[in-house]
Design a protein with these regions (language model features):
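Chalcogenol-based redox active-site neighborhoods
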Residues: 1-217
Length: 217
C-alpha cells in the first residue's frame, strides 16, 4: 500500500454488523487501525484510549474502525476486558478477520498465510500493527507501522488529521512540530503570483522556497 492509492474496498463482519468499507466511510474521513491478536496487552490500552477520544475524531468528521485477526465473538469478549481495565469499551466497530482477508488485502500479512487464527501467536501476526488514514475520496493519506512492543500515540494521529485536513483545503504545508494555530508554509505548488492573491498581506520568507503565513481559518 502507498500513500495516494485507493484504499482497497472489502466486505467484512464487524462487532456492529457487516459492512462494505467504502460505503461505511461515505463522505467522512476514516482511520483503520489493526491489531495482531485479541487479548494482547498493548492493543488493549490502545483500543480503550481510542474509545475515550472518539468524540475528538467525530468532531473532525473522522470515523474510526479497528481490525484484529480473530472472530467478532472474540472481539466482544475482549471489549469487556478493555472496559474493565481501561475504563472505556470500544464505541466503534472492530473488523473480524479470522481468514486474514483484510490483513492480506492491505499487505499486512503475506498472501500465503492460512490456517486457524487461534493457533497463531501475536508474534506470527506482528506486522498487523498499522494505522491508515483514508480521505473521503477513499485515497490513503497516511500510513503508520508500529512494532508490537510500542503503543501508538493517538494524540499524534489527531494532530496528523488536523494537518491533513488543513493542507487538503488550503494548499499549505505544516512545518516540524506544527500544532493547530501555528504558522504554516505555502505549498510549493502555489506560485508567488497566486500566493499574492491568496495572501495580500504577504509572507515571511527566510529563503525564497520557505514562505511562512498564519494558518488559514
Amino acid at each position: 500500500m502507498k500513500i495516494g492509492e485507493t484504499a482497497p474496498d472489502f466486505e467484512a463482519d464487524t462487532t456492529e454488523g457487516k459492512i462494505r468499507f467504502h460505503d461505511w466511510i461515505g463522505s467522512s474521513w476514516a482511520i483503520l487501525f489493526s491489531h495482531p491478536k485479541d487479548f494482547t496487552p498493548v492493543c488493549t490500552t490502545e483500543l480503550g484510549y481510542m474509545a475515550k477520544i472518539n468524540p475528538e475524531f467525530e468532531r473532525r468528521n473522522v470515523k474510526i474502525i479497528g481490525l484484529s485477526v480473530d472472530s467478532a465473538g472474540d472481539h466482544k469478549g475482549w471489549a469487556k476486558d478493555i472496559e474493565e481495565t481501561q475504563g472505556h469499551a470500544p464505541n466503534y466497530p472492530i473488523i473480524a478477520d479470522p481468514e486474514f482477508k483484510v490483513s492480506k488485502l492491505y499487505g499486512m500479512l503475506p498472501a500465503d498465510v492460512s490456517g486457524d487464527p487461534k493457533k497463531r501467536t501475536p508474534a506470527d501476526n506482528a506486522t498487523v500493527r498499522n494505522v491508515y488514514v483514508i480521505g473521503p475520496d477513499k485515497k490513503i493519506k497516511l500510513i503508520l507501522v508500529y512494532p508490537m512492543t510500542t503503543g501508538r500515540n493517538f494524540d499524534e494521529v489527531l494532530r496528523l488529521i488536523d494537518s491533513l485536513q488543513l493542507t487538503a483545503k488550503h494548499q499549505v504545508a505544516t512545518p516540524v512540530n506544527w500544532k493547530p494555530g501555528d504558522d504554516v508554509i505555502i505549498a510549493g505548488s502555489v506560485s508567488d503570483e497566486e500566493a499574492k492573491k491568496r495572501y495580500p498581506a504577504g509572507w515571511k520568507a527566510p529563503r525564497p522556497y520557505i514562505r511562512i503565513v498564519p494558518q488559514p481559518q
